[in-house]
Amino acid sequence: MTKRELPPGLRPETLAVRTAIERSQYGENSEALYLTTGFVQPDAATSAERFASGEGYTYARTSNPTVTAFERRLAALEGTEAAIGASSGMGSILMMIMGLLKAGDHVVLSRSMFGSTLNLFAKEFGKFGVETTFVSQTNVDEWRAAMRPNTRLLFAETPTNPLTEVCDIAALAQIAHDAGALLAVDNAFATPLLQRPVEMGADIVMHSGTKYLDGQGRVMAGALCASRQLVTEKFAPVVRTAGMVLSPFNAWVVLKGMETLGVRVKAHCDNTLAIARWLETQPQVARVYYPGLPSHPQHELAMRQQNGLGGGVLSLELAGDTPEAARAKAFHLIDSCRVLSIATNLGDTKTIISHPATTSHGRLTEAQRQAAGISQGVVRLAVGLEHHEDIQDDLLRGLSTLSA
């Protein structure tokens, strides 16, 4: 069919719906799902040319039209030249490290990152000679002091999981670039509807499409967004050889989920802010961690970076005389809920309640958890799209029977 070029200057909500629509000769209005491992070539010469150049579609491990559509749409939303999909968010991190680093290279990493990310750097990459220094998410001076002549990459997520710490992306970009290094930002919590890290100087934006991009907790997906040069020369050879490819079905599910990203993210943020404000009034809650609250240490920075919104995740802390007592309170609150789901994913339409110290960060050592500020009394809420008062009522079932 004749392709109509989109006009420039479209807003993110429109890009999430209209970008990367490639209709076949049948004129389908919904993006097509190409479930195939191989692509038939018209003749041997064309087959040889495509395999040699990497252009066109030959084999599903190297490229697929549905995956390409997902990549183009995400790149448009993030404002990068290109993007490349991966089987999961963790797969995209593996792709990034394999593509950029070698033995003897050094990475500076926030110690407040997702538990699996911390484990990957602390336990796995060291086996291959990659050196890592963990620093405070919010202390720019620590990032600067950690730089070495062999530092090649700075990596942060903002806001963090689960305590929603926010880093100064522009400041970290300056530190990285002054040293000839790159800055990568995990943008899964914020999504490009709240912040676009490349506009603040980041070189690479990492995504777990499993979360808000999908939006309904259905499939695993990951991606890296960056310059065309980084994607084609550094990342694509890794993912196509190592095989952490994004399946076309998962790409299609996330592609369709992205169409409602604008309305969903705003609703998540509104719900979460209402619940965070309410939790601050509850005597049983010692502290609420949410960037949308003025009480958050990085509130002003978050509002500047995140389009004036706080995101869809908060954590609350329950105090106890001992760690065991605090954990007992947290478990009681979680087990008292009848509406909320006890799980560990986020970005879902359903509100998810979890205990990070024994789930997402359970494989960390106690010292690592303490360094990240994750106590036994911390409970994370990945707020969904239910009515916020129903979520509050569900939490009150447990809170009302706890002592302050």
Regions found by a protein language model. Give the residues of each.
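Conserved PLP-enzyme active-site core in the AAT-like
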Residues: 2-7, 16-22, 82-283, 289
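Conserved small-domain helix->loop->beta segment predominantly found in fold-type I
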Residues: 273-350, 364-370
